[in-house]
Curated annotation (Swiss-Prot):
Residues 910-946, 1214-1268 are annotated as: Disordered. Disulfide bonds: none annotated. This is Vigilin. One of its GO terms (cellular component) is nucleus. The modification Phosphothreonine is found at residues 8, 295-296. The modification Phosphoserine is found at residues 11, 31, 35, 317, 645, 1247. Pfam families: KH_1, KH_Vigilin.
Length: 1268
């Protein structure tokens, strides 16, 4: 069942009544406007007379009287004493020390109170506590608990009094503890003990004990009494509306608790003072005994549905009967099926009570009205407005609508229910006559499409046909749709819904298979591209799968033809995407990546734009050399060629083509490219490029430094020859830590095996999954021999031995510094051998080695070599001016790191000299003599190198000398190149971009002299190896710039054409389209005269460019002028009311006409003298045809305009004949400026007529303070 609550208009009427005074005021104002204007005195009443002012001044200006209550201070101070014998901390020599000070500080921080302590002569402690009352009380309690010795006592009080000591939520107990500064412990309710324990100071215990006993004594005076009274007599004791029991409670001061009717208990509880309680009990017993004797009962049957009317709201009807007749009415509980009502009272009053019970029972009636459930909401009306009319007239009638049932239930006073029933029946009859409903079956899968986005479709149908359409929710899976409303509207809505459903049934759904990687591209950023497709095919619904589903099915749904068109369009789009997703990888040496990128990405950006490809370079910190190019195949190939050409130009890169049969390519590449990768690594990292599989090409391209390319070519041809004759492969396994040892230093060991057996041995690359696998390839006998040798080596490595060697302790540090870097390198190189040096602090020289026998022997040999190097180590000084140090180091010290690796030496640069200028101060004297250092300085040769220039090299003598030569070779050299001064600024480039590019490309520093010097030389500083390349590059740039200068001179040829200014807009074209095409086609610049410049001839058009191109552009312009001169212009009178329709939305219609007839049509601007004059320009025959066409359109559109205007006459509201009179403004009568009286104007100098404000007056002696 569902009830409909209806808002009545009573409360609204009350609220609205507040508006009435405003309406009255408005009416008054309006009447005043119509009557005479007010007088000046009425509008501006005069100020009060002087006497009135003086009168008020007579009173005391607010004295502070005794009526004012003193404001209670928010901060209080309390002082209390702790005797010596009760102090916790007595053995303190000085106040403020030890535990006592800490405790005081803690209490102040926790409570916010301020504490001051002092010692009396008798060594007692005085404590002054200041702060807010609550904080002081808490601080006092803490001080007593922590600074004063604690005693305890027990107080026995009756168990039933304990709850009064605790109080509500324990508040009473907390207050008591704060007030007495004690801790009071009360036994738990389940503990039979009645002892209350108090802990604190003696004084506090006494106070707390007294308070507890006082509470108990108070409770001793009170008593509790329970009186058994039959439940039937409770109403007589309580009295009507509980008045009788209330009077007894008030008179005796006793609390009387009568159980409510719903609780099946008979005892009445009395609480209060013993004497008064006894009086109350006696009075109630008397009432009970009296009623028991005098009363009798009768039982009557009343329908269960009428019981609630007998009870009344909140039991008021029962109380009313009891008050009038003195009879109690007992109603059976609502969950009981009994209909018997018992009346209890004096016999003579039972008849009257019975009459009233039947009157109450029959005063209300329940009725029902038959109404189809679909009409219920129409009966209720929008926001309950229809029902509100009924309930407003009969507020006591309750109307209830039951969902799913064809009836309305009315409940209330009989007369009101009858009236309401008639009204509702009338409404139902009216609705049935003028409304209809229909139910249609449409497959539920189409329901959401019928509803439309955000309910657009269904809302349109509802509004258009004034019907209600009820579509079941998706969860019901029901096909039934119900339409309710006007019969005609219902039929029309039904027809449209069925048509929509039919159309959906005839729709075609097609699944397109599109790779998921293209979905995001088709959708576009923020859905831009898919929006364009949907705009192109608005009737087709395109659904992409959820990215998480990893599905490739894109669903299209809509009319068959549109779906087919959309399918073709999307397939073409996907084909373009596939074509544009062709990808090739180009291996480029890592050091040339920055040159391919160019300064600020200029080179790579240019290649991308010109080839229309996507180019991805590996990250700077990545070891990959591969550049990936994505786009159309032809474009990718072009981009690859350009990138390779850059690499070829930058370095001594050779490129060789080798012909190897295509059938051998896969076997040469090997599993996951392992074989070909091993050849590339062995030959200095050359790049070997095989043709695309299936192309049929035999050409293999090898690219890299010349010597490495030749080596790789020989190996590749040898391997191909082997593959052609016979190929045999064997896999063996070895622990990855053995691989470096098997390969040997610089690949020496493995090369020895290869040379002796002729087999090819391939070790796994770092990215391979199987790191244990070693592959041997070659002829069978060679492979078997190599396998035997390698397995013998691996077997030896598996035999772990432990050996030791003696190493001088002074060399130990070299091996263990930098977290054992040297030891780690030895372990990696020699099969994971473990080398253990003795702990620091011990004088042992024994070093233990553990691992494979061969690895241990090789590691011992290597350690011995290192020791020999350390013992043979020398230090060499290399003098290089400090200003070159940064250049010698290279970016991030890369050049120095390379030298230290190549020559196995250590290089130390000096600290930077902070004050390079030598001091000229006199030398310091000590004890009358010059300092020794000063004398040495004097003896130093002034030509010797400075300390800050000396670089120290440590290592073997021959290696140090080689490293010194390498360092000196890194010192930059400067050369000068002749460059004409006028080209300097072009070499520098915009914001220095040109010169920076050259410096980065050639790794040199280029210095261009200041412009004021007008020098013709440019200085280049850098390594000798780079200077020649840099000089050649600079001279090439000079040649380019000189060629550009010559080209600029040729391009600056100017030609003028004389053209009538009226033709200029046509030559320019819409948005400059025509002139832009001429400019691009002939590669010229065309300048039109400035309209605002009066000195410039307006018929001259200037063309700038190559002489040949300017002449061609001139001919193109003159050709357009020739065509324009043949054109004619005609004015046509065209009714201005149809102009907008001929022009169309955003000018679409007029553009279509102009394109169709090849004419120009100009409409008059707003405010033109003749708004109907339209100008048509073009070739004579085209103009005539265009005029005929627009005149036909005018005739057609005018008929619509006339009909529309005739209709508007009836739609307009009646015009007011009389216009409003102009507003008078604010008018007053008898104003001073309009007065004709002979009254004189006030004398401005008179202090009486114009008194002075702000003058001081002698103050009157009054009690101080404001008036209350």
């Amino acid at each position: 069942m569902s009830s409909v609550a209806v808002l009545t208009q009573e409360s609204f009427a009350e609220h609205r009544s507040g508006l009435v005074p405003q309406q009255i005021i408005v009416a008054t104002l309006n009447s005043e406007e119509e009557s005479d204007p007010p007088t000046y005195k009425d509008a501006f009443p005069p100020l009060p007379e002087k006497a009135a002012c003086l009168e008020s001044a007579q009173e005391p200006a607010g004295a502070w009287s005794n009526k004012i209550r003193p404001i209670k201070a928010s901060v209080i101070t309390q002082v209390f004493h702790v005797p010596l014998e009760e102090r916790k901390y007595k053995d303190m020599n000085q106040f403020g020390e030890g535990e006592q000070a800490k405790i005081c500080l803690e209490i102040m921080q926790r409570t916010g109170a301020h504490l001051e302590l002092s010692l009396a002569k008798d060594q007692g402690l005085s404590i002054m506590v200041s702060g807010k009352l609550d904080a002081v009380m808490k601080a006092r309690k803490d001080i007593v608990a922590r600074l004063q010795t604690q005693a305890s006592a027990t107080v026995p009080i009756p168990k039933e009094h304990h709850r009064f000591v605790i109080g509500k939520n324990g508040e009473k107990l907390q207050d008591l503890e704060l007030k007495t500064a004690t801790k009071i412990q009360i036994p738990r309710p389940d503990d039979p003990s009645n002892q209350i324990k108090i802990t604190g100071t003696k004084e506090g215990i006494e106070k707390a004990r007294h308070e507890v006993l006082l509470i108990s004594a108070e409770q001793d005076k009170r008593a509790v009494k329970r009186l058994e009274v039959e439940k039937a007599f409770h109403p007589f004791i309580a009295g009507p509306y509980n008045r009788l029991v209330g009077e007894i409670m008030q008179e005796t001061g006793t609390r009387i608790n009568i159980p409510p009717p719903s609780v099946n208990r008979t005892e009445i509880v009395f609480t209060g003072e013993k004497e008064q309680l006894a009086q109350a009990v006696a009075r109630i017993k008397k009432i009970y005994e009296e009623k028991k004797k005098k009363t009798t009962t009768i039982a009557v049957e009343v329908k269960k549905s009428q019981h609630k009317y007998v009870i009344g709201p909140k039991g008021n009807s029962l109380q009313e009967i009891l008050e009038r007749t003195g009879v109690s009415v007992e109603i059976p509980p609502s969950d009981s099926i009994s209909e018997t009502v018992i009346l209890r009272g004096e016999p003579e009053k039972l008849g009257q009570a019975l009459t009233e019970v039947y009157a109450k029972a029959n005063s209300f009636t329940v009725s029902s009205v038959s109404a189809p459930s679909w009409l219920h909401r129409f009966i209720i009306g929008k926001k309950g407005q229809n029902l509100a009319k009924i309930t407003h007239q009969m507020p006591k009638v309750h109307i209830e609508f039951t969902e799913g049932e064809d009836k309305i239930t009315l409940e209330g006073p009989t007369e009101d229910v009858n009236v309401a029933q008639e009204q509702i029946e009338g409404m139902v009859k009216d609705l049935i006559n003028r409304m209809d409903y229909v139910e249609i079956n449409i497959d539920h899968k189409f329901h959401r499409h019928l509803i439309g986005k955000s309910g657009a479709n269904i809302n349109r149908i509802k509004d258009q046909y004034k019907v209600s359409v009820r579509i079941p929710p998706d969860s019901e899976k029901s096909n039934l749709i119900r339409i309710e409303g006007d019969p005609q509207g219902v039929q029309q809505a039904k027809r449209e819904l069925l048509e929509l459903a039919s159309r959906m049934e005839n729709e075609r759904t097609k699944d397109l298979i599109i790779e998921q990687r293209f979905h995001r591209t088709i959708i576009g950023q923020k859905g831009e591209r898919i929006r364009e497709i949907r705009d192109k095919f608005p009737e087709v619904i395109i659904n992409f799968p959820d990215p998480a589903q990893k599905s490739e099915i894109v669903q299209l749904r809509g009319p068959k033809n549109e779906v087919e068109k959309c399918t073709k369009y999307m397939q073409k789009m996907v084909a373009d995407l596939v074509e544009n997703s062709y990808s090739i990888s180009v291996p480029i040496f890592k050091q040339f990546h920055k040159n391919i990128i160019g300064k600020g990405g200029a080179n790579i950006k240019k290649i991308r734009e010109e080839s229309n490809t996507k180019i991805d370079l590996p990250a700077e910190n990545s070891n990959s050399e591969t550049i990936v190019i994505t786009g159309k195949r032809a474009n990718c190939e072009a981009a690859r060629s350009r990138i390779l050409s850059i690499q070829k130009d930058l370095a001594n890169i050779a490129e060789v083509e080798v012909s190897i049969p295509a059938k051998l390519h896969n076997s040469l590449i090997g599993t996951k490219g392992r074989l070909i990768r091993s050849i590339m690594e062995e030959c200095g990292g050359v790049h070997i490029h095989f043709p695309v599989e299936g192309s049929g090409s035999d050409t293999v391209v090898i690219r890299g430094p010349s010597s490495d390319v030749e080596k790789a070519k020989k190996q590749l041809l040898h391997l191909a020859e082997e593959k052609q004759t016979k190929s045999f492969t064997v896999d063996i396994r070895a622990k990855p830590e053995y691989h470096k040892f098997l390969i040997g230093k610089g690949g020496g060991k493995i090369r020895k095996v290869r040379d002796s057996t002729g087999a090819r041995i391939i070790f796994p690359a770092a990215e391979d999954k199987d790191q244990d696998l070693i592959t041997i390839i070659g002829k069978e006998d060679a492979v078997r021999e190599a396998q035997k040798e390698l397995e013998a080596l691996i077997q030896n490595l598996d035999n772990v031995v432990e050996d030791y060697m003696l190493v001088d302790p002074r060399h130990h540090r070299h091996f263990v510094i930098r977290r054992g870097q040297v030891l780690r390198e030895i372990a990696e190189e020699y099969g994971g051998v473990m080398v253990s040096f003795p702990r620091s602090g011990t004088q042992s020289d024994k070093v233990t080695l553990k691992g494979a026998k061969d690895c241990v022997e090789a590691a011992k040999k290597r350690i011995q070599e290192i020791i020999e190097d350390l013992e043979a180590q020398v230090t060499l000084e290399c003098a290089i001016p400090q200003k070159f140090h940064r250049s010698v180091m290279g970016p991030k010290g890369s050049r120095i790191q390379q030298i230290t690796r190549d020559y196995n030496v250590q290089i130390k640069f000096p600290d930077r000299e902070e004050n390079p200028v030598h001091s000229v101060e006199p030398s310091i004297q000590e004890n009358g003599d010059e300092a020794g250092e000063g004398r040495e300085a004097k003896e130093t040769d002034p030509g010797s190198p400075r300390r800050c220039d000396i670089i120290v090299i440590s290592g073997r003598k021959e290696k140090c000398e080689a490293a010194k030569e390498a360092l000196e070779a890194l010192v930059p050299v400067t050369i000068e190149v002749e460059v004409p001064f006028d080209l300097h600024r072009y070499i520098i480039g915009q914001k220095g971009s040109g010169i920076r590019k050259m410096m980065d490309e050639f790794e040199v520093n280029i210095h261009v002299p200041a412009p004021e010097l007008q020098s013709h030389t440019i200085a280049i500083t850098g390594l000798a190896a780079n200077l020649d390349r840099a000089k050649a590059g600079l001279l090439d740039r000079v040649k380019e710039l000189q060629a550009e200068q010559e080209d600029r001179a040729l391009r600056s040829f100017k030609l003028s054409v004389t053209v009538d200014p009226k033709y200029h807009p046509k030559i320019i074209g819409g948005k400059g389209a025509v002139i832009t095409q001429i400019r691009l086609e002939h590669d010229v610049n065309i300048q039109f005269p400035d309209k605002d410049d009066g000195n410039q001839p307006q018929d001259q058009i200037t063309i700038t460019g190559y002489e040949k191109n300017t002449e061609a552009a001139r001919d193109a312009i003159l050709k357009i002028v020739g065509e324009l001169e043949q054109m004619v212009s005609e004015d046509v009178p065209l009714d201005h009311r149809v102009h907008a329709r001929i022009i169309g939305a955003r000018g679409k219609a007029i553009r279509k006409i102009m394109d169709e007839f090849k004419v120009d049509i100009r409409f008059p601007q707003s405010g033109a003298p003749d708004p109907n004059c339209v100008t048509v320009t073009g070739l004579p025959e085209n103009v005539e045809e265009a005029i005929d066409h627009i005149l036909n359109l005018e005739e057609e559109y005018l008929a619509d305009v006339v009909d529309s205007e005739a209709l508007q006459v009836y739609m307009k509201p009646p015009a007011h004949e009389e216009s409003k009179a102009p507003s008078k403004g604010f008018v007053v009568r008898d104003a001073p400026w309009t007065s004709n009286s002979s009254e004189k104007a006030p004398d401005m100098s008179s202090s009486e007529e114009i008194p002075t404000f702000g003058a001081q007056v002698a103050p009157k002696t009054l009690p101080w303070g404001p008036k209350r």
